[in-house]
Amino acid sequence: MQLNSTEISELIKQRIAQFNVVSEAHNEGTIVSVSDGVIRIHGLADCMQGEMISLPGNRYAIALNLERDSVGAVVMGPYADLAEGMKVKCTGRILEVPVGRGLLGRVVNTLGAPIDGKGPVDNDGFSAVEAIAPGVIDRQSVDQPVQTGYKAVDSMIPIGRGQRELIIGDRQTGKTALAIDAIINQRDSGIKCIYVAIGQKASTISNVVRKLEEHGALANTIVVVATASESAALQYLAPYAGCAMGEYFRDRGEDALIIYDDLSKQAVAYRQISLLLRRPPGREAFPGDVFYLHSRLLERAARVNADYVEAYTKGEVKGKTGSLTALPIIETQAGDVSAFVPTNVISITDGQIFLESNLFNAGIRPAVNPGISVSRVGGAAQTKIMKKLSGGIRTALAQYRELAAFSQFASDLDDATRKQLDHGQKVTELLKQKQYAPMSVAQQSLVLFAAERGYLADVELAKIGSFEAALLAYVDRDHAPLMQEINQSGGYNDEIEGKLKGILDSFKATQSW
C-alpha cells in the first residue's frame, strides 16, 4: 500500500499536534561545601535573600549570603548526610509558617509542625516569617492595660496592649516565672498568648506546658519551641515564626501577647550562623546587624488602628483595633546590663522590668528592682483605680531604700524616719507574691489601698502575709459584688473609696489574722 504525499503531510501534522512538550525551568545548583549546618552552593543564578532552597530528602535551607559566584545557606534540620556535589534547587518562596486559631492549645516547632503528639494542626493559611512592621499612620497609642496579676508589676511598671516591655535579669531570678504567670492571668481576658522557647532544655519546656495546662491557660496559648538540641538556624528563626502567628490575631482586630524566652540565646545562635558564613565580627564577636535582628522583630509588636484592621480584613472587621504586646526576656551575666545585647534591647523596648538576684535570694519574689525598672508608655494604659492607689507605693519604696542604706550608719533615728522605714519594710513584704497565684485588679487595689491608707501600721511585719490572705478571703466571702464591679470598670471615685474604707475598717475590727 502506497501513501500519497497529501496523506503523509496530514499524518505528520497529526503527530505534531499530538506531540506533548513539557519543559520545566529549574534554577539548579551544586553543593560545594558542607560545614556545621552551613552549605555553600555554586550555580544558583536567581536566588533571593531569605529564599528557601530545596535539598535532597524533603529538607530546606535558607539563603543568607548572596555572593558573586556562590550562595551561603543554613540548613533547617539535620545535615550529616549532605555531601559535596549534591544538586539543590531554588523554590522561589520565602519561608512561611501556618497561622490561625487551630494552633491555639498546641506545641509546634519553628516551622509550625506539631510536636505534642496530638495529630495535625488546623490552620487558616500561611504567613511569611519576615514581615514589615506597621507604619506610623497605621498605629494607635497604647491606652488599654495588660494585667500580669503581679502587684509589683501592675502597680509600678504597668504594661499596655501593644507595648514592648523587656524582662531582664541574671539566670534563676524568676524571669520565665513572671512571663508564665502573665500568660496564666490572660485565661479569661480574651488575650491570645504565644510563648516562644529558644534554646531551652526540652524538660524545662515540658514543665512549662504542663503548668499552663494545669492552670487552664494552654487552650488560648501557642507554644513555639526551638530546643537547645536543634540547629542554630531554627533557634534564630523561632521568634519570627511566633511573631507571624501573633500578627494573625493583631491584624484581625484582636489582642495577643507574645513572650520571647529568651532573645540572648537567639542572638548567640545568630552569631554562630554569621561566623560560619564568614561575616565580619564586631563587638563581642556579634555581627554588625545584631541590633536590626531584634529591632525588626520587636517593632512588629504594636497597637494598630481600626482603619488598618478594616483594610487588612477587606471590611470584614470594622471599628476594632488590634494589638500585639511583646515581653522579650534577656539574660544578663552577673547583673551587667551594659553588655551589647542587653543595651540594644533596652533601647528598642518601651521599658524594662529588672529582676535582681540578691533580692531573689533575700526572698523578695518577684525580685523586681523598682528603682531601675520603668514602663515608658504603660502609665497611659493603667486602670484608674490602680493609677490612683499605686502612686505612693513607688515613692515609699524609693524613700525606704534610701533610708535603709543611711540607717545602717545612724545609731538613733527620729520617729518620722522610723515610721518611713517601717512602712517601707511592710510595703516590700506586701508586694511579695507566690508563683501561679495571679491577683485580679480588685484584689490588688484593695491591698494597695490598705498600704496607702496606713492600715498596715499596727500589723506586725511577720503577719503581713497572713493579713493579706485573711483580707482577700473576707472580701471574697462578704463583698464579692464590689470586687466584681471594680474588676469590670476599673474606676475610682468617692463611693468606691468609701466602700473600700468600710471593708478595711470592719475587717480590722475582726482581728482574724
UniProtKB/Swiss-Prot annotation:
It holds the Pfam family ATP-synt_ab_N. It is an enzyme of class 7 (translocase). Keywords: ATP synthesis, ATP-binding, Cell inner membrane, Cell membrane, CF(1), Hydrogen ion transport, Ion transport, Membrane, Nucleotide-binding, Translocase, Transport. It is a peripheral membrane protein. Its main location: membrane. It catalyses: ATP + H2O + 4 H(+)(in) = ADP + phosphate + 5 H(+)(out). PROSITE patterns: ATPASE_ALPHA_BETA (PS00152). The record marks S373 as: Required for activity. InterPro entries: ATP_synth_asu-like_sf, ATP_synth_asu_C, ATP_synth_asu_C_sf, ATP_synth_F1_a_nt-bd_dom, ATP_synth_F1_asu, ATPase_a/bsu_AS, ATPase_F1/V1/A1_a/bsu_N, ATPase_F1/V1/A1_a/bsu_N_sf. It is found in: Cell inner membrane. One of its GO terms (cellular component) is plasma membrane. GO terms for molecular function: ADP binding; ATP binding; proton-transporting ATP synthase activity, rotational mechanism. Its EC number is 7.1.2.2. ATP binds at G169, D170, R171, Q172, T173, G174, K175, T176. Belongs to the ATPase alpha/beta chains family. F-type ATPases have 2 components, CF(1) - the catalytic core - and CF(0) - the membrane proton channel. CF(1) has five subunits: alpha(3), beta(3), gamma(1), delta(1), epsilon(1). CF(0) has three main subunits: a(1), b(2) and c(9-12). The alpha and beta chains form an alternating ring which encloses part of the gamma chain. CF(1) is attached to CF(0) by a central stalk formed by the gamma and epsilon chains, while a peripheral stalk is formed by the delta and b chains. PANTHER family: ATP SYNTHASE SUBUNIT ALPHA, MITOCHONDRIAL. Produces ATP from ADP in the presence of a proton gradient across the membrane. The alpha chain is a regulatory subunit. This is ATP synthase subunit alpha. It comes from Salmonella arizonae (strain ATCC BAA-731 / CDC346-86 / RSK2980). The gene is atpA.
